[in-house]
A protein has these predicted regions:
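Extracellular glycan-recognition surfaces and repeat-rich motifs
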Residues: 62-93
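Extracellular ligand-binding interfaces
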Residues: 115-173
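Exposed low-complexity, polar/acidic, P/S/T/G-rich flexible segments that act as propeptides
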Residues: 206-223
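Short beta-strand-plus-loop segments that form exposed binding edges in beta-rich domains
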Residues: 172-177, 199-209
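Extended, low-complexity, turn-rich repeat/linker tracts enriched in Gly/Pro/Ser/Thr and Asp/Glu
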Residues: 71-75, 88-90, 103-104, 114-132, ...
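Beta-rich interaction/scaffold domains
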Residues: 1-60
């Protein structure tokens, strides 16, 4: 579009400058122009759909599938971001991305993922006897939803023999080979144009607990 073309030209012209004083003025202006271009494009993309349709805005997220490790994610560092997934183990955390100048409306943030409430034996027992607590969650600004249990009844795995995911490699297989652990979604209504903070957190410590996840998606619900 013309807006993007103009912003890119402005950025290229800024990069051609050589003096520090010129660069210090031109680069911030070029960055603001690029952000404005993304804002205009996003607003146009979210308009003109049938009410209730989902518009995929995942392209606004940096590295939503962890194919580039932890790139793009702020806050608490992942325990690991390898084998195409990311994880937190035995810690509290708050990890997120902030999307600026988003159009007003309803958003949905989804992921494949699960939470294990401690060591696998005690977590399984807690799931079976109803004492399990799902401490890890997805959030969109002030809305939050917990991750599903590793031992959720929809998962086609067994405890004996143990075939549930037990490391990042087997979690990657569960997500990307088997297509499991998809029931993780949070919804938030942004009442006016503004920022969206999308992330995941856990504020309560639990010994040897585990949260593993992949394939984040951001969707706008057309109105």
């Amino acid at each position: 579009s013309q807006v993007f073309d103009a912003a890119i030209r402005q950025a290229e012209e800024a990069l051609d400058l050589t003096s520090v004083s010129e660069l210090s003025m031109a680069l911030p202006a070029a960055y603001e122009a690029l952000k404005a271009a993304v804002e205009t494009y996003t607003e146009g993309l979210c308009a003109g759909w049938t009410p209730g349709e989902e518009v995929d805005l995942t392209w606004l997220l940096v590295n939503p599938d962890f194919s580039e490790g932890s790139k793009g994610w702020e806050g608490t560092s992942f325990t690991a971001a390898s084998s195409g997934v990311a994880e937190f183990y035995d810690k509290t955390y708050d990890t997120y991305q902030v999307l600026e100048r988003m159009p007003a409306g309803t958003y949905r943030f989804r992921a494949q993922g699960f939470y294990r409430y401690g060591d696998k034996a005690e977590a399984y027992d807690a799931h079976q006897d109803g004492s399990e607590q799902l401490l890890a969650g997805l959030y969109l600004n002030s809305s939050r939803q917990t991750f599903m249990s590793l031992f959720d009844g929809s998962a086609p795995y067994t405890y004996n023999p143990y075939t549930y995911p037990d490391d990042v490699r087997s979690a990657d297989n569960a997500f990307n080979r088997d297509g499991e652990y998809r029931a993780n979604e949070v919804e938030y209504e942004l009442l006016a144009k503004g920022d969206l903070r999308v992330g995941l957190d856990k504020t309560e410590y639990r010994y040897h607990d585990w949260n593993c996840f992949d394939n984040f998606k951001l969707l706008y619900v057309a109105k």
